[in-house]
Amino acid sequence: MSLSKRELDELKPWIEKTVKRVLGFSEPTVVTAALNCVGKGMDKKKAADHLKPFLDDSTLRFVDKLFEAVEEGRSSRHSKSNSDRNRKRELKDVFGDDSEVSKESSGVKKRRIPRFEEVEDEPEVIPGPPSESPGMLTKLQIKQMMEAATRQIEERKKQLSFISPPTPQPKISSSSQSERLPIGNTVQPSQAATFMNDAIEKARKAAELQARIQAQLALKPGLIGNANMVGLANLHAMGIAPPKVELKDQTKPTPLILDEQGRTVDATGKEIELTHRMPTLKANIRAVKREQFKQQLKEKPSEDMESNTYFDLRVSITPAQRQKRTFKFHEKGKFEKIAQRLRTKAQLKKLQAEISQAARKTGIHTSTKLALITPKKELKEGEIPEIEWWDSYIIPNGLDLKGGTSSKKDEYFGITNLVEHPAQLNPPVDSDTPVTLGVYLTKKEQKKLRRQTRREAQKELQEKVRLGLMPPPEPKVRISNLMRVLGTEAVQDPTKVEAHVRAQMAKRQKAHEEANAARKLTAEQRKAKKIKKLKEDVSQGVHIAVYRVRNLSNPAKKFKIEANAGQLYLTGVVVLHKDVNVVVVEGGPKAQKKFKRLMLHRIKWDEQTSNTKGEDDDESDEESVKKTNKCSLVWEGTAKDRSFGEMKFKQCPTENMAREHFKKHGAEHYWDLALSESVLESTD
């Protein structure tokens, strides 16, 4: 439920105090947002969402307090409205009734309800200790007010020709108050004094109550507006002027004074500059709060540690501080040394790879050759051999390695003191032209492009017809639109028209079929298209893969290798040797990918192979069963040209024969790689 403007004005001071208590400082933006939430009748959830950007974690607590204050304000206004209805009293409730006084003269005096008793009963308005309130009247001020009221009464009596003593009369008792007033225009002096004393007593109580209210309002500025001015006006209307009360701790705002030019001036007329409050960001607010918190920590008095029995003056207390980070400059040449070290390491690895590759090419891989190369005599520790074992394989036998001049025939041919730097050639496979991906249209774009093309072709035909270059096409007549196209002709001779329409339909169907037949490929064209799709362009380089199979005696597996190589248009060779069956294939990357999946995944090499040698070789069969058959990829890469033709099988009983077959095609290193892996596997 939304609140009125008056209720929002009453609620605004409380919201300002709550914001200051929650945030630690006043923020007009939050106050305005809270007033908007209450004024629009939002519930707690919506108000919390609206105020969360301003208050963060304190939002729920602030919203609960806000709605509690709104409910208290509604209940207080409701009770106040009920009390206002009962507050309308007649004059007899204040001054008493003559008939009632005469009837109850013998009894106890009737209690008269003061005007401000209801206000005095409210615990929220009257503060606890009256002496502490800055706006409460002192005893001296009340005495001055009483003397002023007495003087006014005396002057009034003189005007009414009543004689009364100058001193103020004391309070009359209950017996004197119960006297009946005479009926007539004349009033007795005693009765007039009684009335005046009652009026003075009521005025004194009203002044005390008004002073308390003023003190309470001074603590809460702007809560009820100018309520104190209303009370002062009532006192002046009664003829009693209360003395001025100086409030030292008054928190009312300074009145705004403007000169003729609209500038802000003080009481002396001097121009002053007002502080302009501008909205700020949340980050700035947090920064201010952080600085205030640090200042409070600095100003916090330190504890008296000297009184502690465990305090040692010799130990210095140094707070934990973060060390400042300084610049650390690298020495000159540091990264050059690191790069040189990495280059040296890479060259060493490359040299080791070249040495191992040369050893494989020369055939230094079997255990027998290694045994021949190793020195026969054992050298003692610290003894230097005449020749190293790796040089003994190269240097011819009978060479005198002792001191002396060597003859010209012992000199090596082609060895000089010059270093040959071969010309650098570009790699045959890598192309300098960048690879660009084609742009593929979506289905929607393809349809749009097709519509545009057909529309342009149709426009071109229409232009030719319009210019007379070609006759206009016949109307496309169907059975469904027969009557609409031909009209009266169809009505006159329907049979003739139907035959004409069917002839046109057959003509269109025939033209369509002829166009399809013209576009259809012949058997040779389809075959060439399929071959072109399977054959790949190897002008930039041929992809080569070398496989090693332990046992390739099964004819079914041989047929699979040969058939798939022919279907994928791969070239190569299969060399059959005991425990070393080498398969070399050459072709494009797509075909190599399919053949690799065939060799490593599709063919089950560990299946039981057929015994082609008969029943005589029982021992060899047992050994083959113990060794599980498998296929491994030895090497794959690229070369400039093909080395082999159509896929063929070659039976080689010895290693030299197999190597010679590869050497004839310039690919003996394939055999060396496969054989070295087989030797290493057998030694393991």
From Swiss-Prot:
All copies of domain PWI, residue ranges: 1-87
UniProt keyword Oxidoreductase present: no
Residue ranges with Polar residues bias: 170-183
Organism superkingdom: Eukaryota
Region (Disordered): 73-109, 162-183
Chief localisation class: nucleus
Coiled-coil region(s): none
InterPro entries assigned: Pre-mRNA_splic_Prp3_dom, Prp3, Prp3_C, PWI_dom, PWI_dom_sf
GO biological process: one example: mRNA splicing, via spliceosome
Any one cellular-component term (Gene Ontology): spliceosomal complex
PROSITE patterns given in the database record: PWI
Subunit structure, as described in the record: Component of the precatalytic spliceosome (spliceosome B complex). Component of the U4/U6-U5 tri-snRNP complex, a building block of the precatalytic spliceosome (spliceosome B complex). The U4/U6-U5 tri-snRNP complex is composed of the U4, U6 and U5 snRNAs and at least PRPF3, PRPF4, PRPF6, PRPF8, PRPF31, SNRNP200, TXNL4A, SNRNP40, SNRPB, SNRPD1, SNRPD2, SNRPD3, SNRPE, SNRPF, SNRPG, DDX23, CD2BP2, PPIH, SNU13, EFTUD2, SART1 and USP39, plus LSM2, LSM3, LSM4, LSM5, LSM6, LSM7 and LSM8.
Identification of the protein by name: U4/U6 small nuclear ribonucleoprotein Prp3
